[in-house]
């Protein structure tokens, strides 16, 4: 690197530091308005706040919960997505993550906790057992939590990795940003519009079937 003691002219044509250029402001009031005033729709601002401050309910059922908690460590840092504030009460949470096997005796408890959550609220089904019962096709295991509560995002895997949980959070944030719901109390039908999100399986189908790198049977 070449060093020089020549002073850089911030207003010169051959300026190497464009961020240091001094702008000539004709109207200081207009400059302050541009810096401090944001024009947009109220629904978009509310959804922006909701999707970036999701409070998950601290509730786990099985080994998938261990992977969920792993995402809160410094290696993954789920705080980047604003979902690191675990709540111990369903009345203070807006996201329930059903992580693990849902037994028949546990279904009424999950249903009651879900009913205690305030609107708006969302549900993530984490793991094969929560999605469809997994390997436990028996009388004591519910074959999917969507049998008694609505589910917004499904995470496949047994158990899924923490990266899959964070991807589910990003998909949920994308869905929340497109939601439309009343901003005040409404008697009767709330008129909530939820975006019809395409499944990851269908979205990546073209990439999945486009076989470009063929491996030999010995490498598979």
UniProtKB/Swiss-Prot annotation:
Record InterPro entries: NADH_UbQ_OxRdtase-like_20kDa (IPR006137), NADH_UQ_OxRdtase_20Kd_su (IPR006138)
Cofactor(s) listed: [4Fe-4S] cluster
Chain's role: NDH-1 shuttles electrons from NADH, via FMN and iron-sulfur (Fe-S) centers, to quinones in the respiratory chain. The immediate electron acceptor for the enzyme in this species is believed to be ubiquinone. Couples the redox reaction to proton translocation (for every two electrons transferred, four hydrogen ions are translocated across the cytoplasmic membrane), and thus conserves the redox energy in a proton gradient.
Catalytic activity, as annotated: a quinone + NADH + 5 H(+)(in) = a quinol + NAD(+) + 4 H(+)(out)
Cofactor note: Binds 1 [4Fe-4S] cluster.
The protein, known as: NADH-quinone oxidoreductase subunit B
Naturally occurring in which organism (per UniProt): Shigella dysenteriae serotype 1 (strain Sd197)
EC number: 7.1.1.-
HAMAP family (alphabetical): NDH1_NuoB
Gene: nuoB
Keyword terms: 4Fe-4S, Cell inner membrane, Cell membrane, Iron, Iron-sulfur, Membrane, Metal-binding, NAD, Quinone, Translocase, Transport, Ubiquinone
GO BP annotations, alphabetical order: aerobic respiration; electron transport coupled proton transport
């Amino acid at each position: 690197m070449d060093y020089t003691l020549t002073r850089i002219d911030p207003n010169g044509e051959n300026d190497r530091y464009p961020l240091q250029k001094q702008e000539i402001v004709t109207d200081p009031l207009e400059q302050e308005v541009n810096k401090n005033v944001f024009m947009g729709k109220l629904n978009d601002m509310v959804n922006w706040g909701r999707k970036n401050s999701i409070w998950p309910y601290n509730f786990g059922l099985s080994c998938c919960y261990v992977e969920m908690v792993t995402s809160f460590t410094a290696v993954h840092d789920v705080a980047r997505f604003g979902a690191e504030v675990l709540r111990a009460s369903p009345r203070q949470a807006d996201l329930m993550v059903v992580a693990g096997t849902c037994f028949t005796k546990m279904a009424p408890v999950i249903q009651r906790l879900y009913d205690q959550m305030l609107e708006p609220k969302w549900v993530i089904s984490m793991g094969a057992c929560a999605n469809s019962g997994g390997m436990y096709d028996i009388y004591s295991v519910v074959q999917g939590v969507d049998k008694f509560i609505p589910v917004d995002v499904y995470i496949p895997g047994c158990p899924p990795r923490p990266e899959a949980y964070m991807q589910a959070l990003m998909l949920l944030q994308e869905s929340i940003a497109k939601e439309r719901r009343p901003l005040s109390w409404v008697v009767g039908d709330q008129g909530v519009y939820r975006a019809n999100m395409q499944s990851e399986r269908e979205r990546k189908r073209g990439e999945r079937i486009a076989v470009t790198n063929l491996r030999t049977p010995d490498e598979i």
